[in-house]
């Protein structure tokens, strides 16, 4: 029987999941997105050519790999079709290999308007949303009033539901946020205009996954964002609106947890975060600026600069627990090349003493200071190294210390952005 693997982020997103999914799909029959929307930004570098994907699974650049968008994803049809067009310009036959669940909730213009209006009026406590309508679309889904992709193929029903929704949302936009309403007819015409382009790609994704399972095919599930942004387990309220942990795989695809064989957690060799929210190891000095510059820490979706800090074993231990991580992939090790010393956060400290467990909400991080272990750095370059034996001794010691601190094996080490710049110690599909 085939093996089924989940790849997800263990920090606050931007860990390098796209590259690893692309690398591992040489042995997969299908890749599935199961949560999030086009707020994700997965960067792939293949033979020096960079591709950024937002909605389409990262397996799309591998010939003959099926790419599936599960019911847990919220879809902006205009953004999806633009992404398809860009890939087709590069000669990628997207429409032949992409299948989308009709149960995906749609992101429509009023979701974007609400998202941006809310963030604009927050005087403090800004969430740091991408402003792309993700949160409001999930709100409609949970409130059981969301429009789904399948609704596009029944124009009369779609128009009726849209009219009711716009009455509600426009009232909020005009009376609470004091902004212009969203036009019904324009929204209706645009949405129904997408139906013809999307229809050939619509399929029962859950049924297809179980077909593949029965055939013994290998399936990969590609997470977006990171575990500490999970709506339930993240640094609430500075989180995304979907289930970014391994549990979201089942609910967002219709593929039960019993069939998942290996969960790969992606973690940077340091820590980053975009937008607001707690970040105990954040650096405001030259080292932080160095990590941001050398690591090219700018969001692939928003272009926003990422906050940078030392590696945090406390949050990684929590991510390992809530995801049942089988093994880790350590990315961007090369960014630490040249530093005289490197630090790892092993615990936090507050007025009451030492804290070894990650808090369960943002407010509980207030007053926490990191407790660091310091290790010697390495002057040698790790860029492009493909075997453990070639690593500098101090870099290897750093890796081994992370394994000891978090209690999980590091099975893959990324030493550069290209898919070939990788050390694979244990293949998830093996």
UniProtKB/Swiss-Prot annotation:
Cofactor note: Binds 1 Mg(2+) ion per subunit.
MF annotations from Gene Ontology: adenylosuccinate synthase activity; GTP binding; magnesium ion binding
Binding site for Mg(2+): 14, 41
Known EC number: 6.3.4.4
GO CC terms of this entry: cytoplasm
Biological-process GO terms, alphabetical: 'de novo' AMP biosynthetic process; IMP metabolic process
Top class in the EC scheme: ligase
SMART domains listed in its UniProt record: Adenylsucc_synt
CDD domains in UniProt: AdSS
Subcellular location: Cytoplasm
Pathway(s) where this gene product acts: Purine metabolism; AMP biosynthesis via de novo pathway; AMP from IMP: step 1/2
Broad class of where this protein is predominantly found: cytoplasm
Active site: 14, 42
Residues annotated for IMP binding in this entry: 14-17, 39-42, 130, 144, 225, 240, 304
Residues bound to substrate: 300-306
Record: residues binding GTP: 13-19, 41-43, 306, 332-334, 414-416
Catalytic activity, as annotated: IMP + L-aspartate + GTP = N(6)-(1,2-dicarboxyethyl)-AMP + GDP + phosphate + 2 H(+)
Subunit structure: Homodimer.
Record family assignment: Belongs to the adenylosuccinate synthetase family.
Primary role: Plays an important role in the de novo pathway of purine nucleotide biosynthesis. Catalyzes the first committed step in the biosynthesis of AMP from IMP.
UniProt-recorded name of the protein: Adenylosuccinate synthetase
Species the sequence originates in: Azotobacter vinelandii (strain DJ / ATCC BAA-1303)
């Amino acid at each position: 029987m085939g093996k089924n693997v989940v790849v997800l982020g263990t920090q606050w997103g931007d860990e390098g999941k796209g590259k690893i999914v692309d690398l591992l799909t040489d042995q997969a029959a299908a890749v599935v997105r199961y949560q999030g929307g086009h707020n994700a930004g997965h960067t792939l570098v293949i033979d020096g050519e960079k591709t950024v994907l937002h909605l389409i699974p990262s397996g799309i650049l591998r010939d003959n790999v099926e790419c599936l968008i599960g019911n847990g994803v919220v879809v902006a049809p205009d953004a999806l079709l633009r992404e398809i067009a860009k890939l087709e310009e590069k000669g990628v036959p997207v429409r032949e290999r992409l299948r989308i669940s009709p149960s995906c909730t749609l992101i429509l213009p009023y979701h974007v308007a609400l998202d941006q209006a809310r963030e604009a009026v927050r005087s403090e406590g800004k969430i740091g949303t991408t402003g792309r309508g993700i949160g409001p679309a999930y709100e409609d889904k949970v409130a059981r009033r969301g429009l789904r992709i399948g609704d596009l193929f029944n124009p009369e029903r779609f128009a009726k539901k849209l009219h009711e929704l716009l009455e509600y949302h426009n009232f909020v936009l005009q009376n609470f946020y004091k902004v212009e309403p969203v036009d019904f007819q324009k929204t209706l015409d645009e949405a129904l205009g997408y139906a013809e382009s999307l229809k050939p790609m619509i399929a029962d994704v859950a049924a297809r996954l179980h077909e593949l399972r029965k055939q013994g095919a290998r399936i990969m599930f590609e997470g977006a964002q990171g575990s500490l942004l999970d709506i339930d387990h993240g640094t609430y309220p500075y989180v995304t609106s979907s289930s970014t942990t391994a549990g979201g795989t089942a609910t967002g695809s219709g593929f039960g947890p019993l069939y998942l064989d290996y969960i790969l957690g992606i973690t940077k060799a340091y820590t980053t975060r975009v937008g607001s929210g707690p970040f105990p190891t954040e650096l405001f000095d030259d080292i932080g600026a160095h990590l941001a510059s050398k690591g090219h820490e700018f969001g692939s979706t928003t272009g926003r600069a990422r906050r940078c800090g030392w590696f945090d074993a406390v949050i990684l231990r929590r991510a390992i627990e809530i995801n049942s991580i089988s093994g880790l992939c350590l990315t961007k090790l090369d960014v630490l090349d040249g530093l005289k010393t490197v630090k790892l956060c092993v615990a936090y400290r507050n007025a009451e003493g030492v804290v070894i467990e990650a808090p369960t909400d943002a407010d509980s991080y207030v007053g926490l200071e990191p407790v660091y272990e310091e290790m010697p750095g390495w002057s040698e370059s790790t860029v492009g190294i493909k075997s453990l034996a070639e690593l500098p001794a101090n870099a290897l010691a750093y890796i081994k210390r992370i394994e000891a601190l978090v209690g999980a094996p590091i099975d893959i080490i990324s030493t550069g952005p290209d898919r070939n710049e990788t050390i694979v110690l244990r293949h998830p599909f093996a």
